[in-house]
Design a protein with these regions (language model features):
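C-terminal nucleotide
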Residues: 1-107, 118-152
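Conserved glycine-rich beta-strand-loop-beta hairpin in the small C-terminal domain of fold type I
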Residues: 115
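Long, low-complexity C-terminal extensions of enzymes
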Residues: 111-112
C-alpha cells in the first residue's frame, strides 16, 4: 500500500449530499456476492478495478477532471452491474442535475443504495448546485497532520 498526499485545494471541489435514507447493507452485499458468479457481472467488477487503478494515477497527478471522469465511468458500470435489484432513481436525479449544471461527476457512497452522494466539480458550480437542491450538503474537512490523508 502507498500513501497519497492530498492538495487541500482539491477538497473544495468535492461536496457530499445526504439523501436522508438508509438501507440494509447486508442484503445488498449478499446479492452482490451472488451476482459475481455470473461471468458478465464479474467482467463489470474487473473493469471497475482497472478504472480504480487508472484513477489513482490521476489523483497522484492532482488531475481532478480526469479523476472525476474515471469516477463517472466506474459509477455507470456499477449501476449496470446492480440494476436488477437497486433503484438509483433518486441518486441519478441529483447526479444528472449536478452534471447538467457544471459538475464533473457524481457517485453514491457507502453500501447499499442510500446515504451520501458525492459530487465533484468546480467550487463555484458546486456552490450554485448546493443552493438550488433540497439535500443537506457537507464539505469534507481534514485535520492537518504530518501523515498522508489517503492510504491506498
Amino acid at each position: 500500500m502507498s500513501f497519497l498526499p492530498i492538495d487541500l485545494r482539491m477538497i473544495g471541489k468535492i461536496r457530499l449530499f445526504y439523501i436522508n435514507k438508509t438501507s440494509i447493507s447486508h442484503s445488498i452485499t449478499t446479492k452482490n456476492i451472488s451476482l459475481i458468479k455470473n461471468k458478465d457481472n464479474l467482467r463489470y467488477l474487473l473493469e471497475i478495478l482497472d478504472i480504480t487503478k487508472e484513477s489513482k494515477k490521476y489523483l497522484e497527478k492532482e488531475n481532478l477532471v480526469k479523476f472525476a471522469k474515471m469516477i463517472d465511468k466506474s459509477w455507470e458500470l456499477k449501476k449496470r452491474y446492480q440494476e436488477s435489484f437497486i433503484d438509483y432513481k433518486e441518486c441519478n436525479s441529483l447526479i444528472d442535475y449536478a452534471k447538467n449544471n457544471g459538475a464533473y461527476c457524481g457517485k453514491l457512497l457507502g453500501a447499499g443504495m442510500r446515504g451520501f452522494v458525492m459530487i465533484i466539480g468546480p467550487e463555484n458550480k458546486l456552490n450554485n448546485i448546493t443552493d438550488k437542491i433540497k439535500y443537506r450538503s457537507l464539505s469534507p474537512k481534514f485535520v492537518m497532520t504530518n501523515q498522508p490523508i489517503i492510504k491506498l
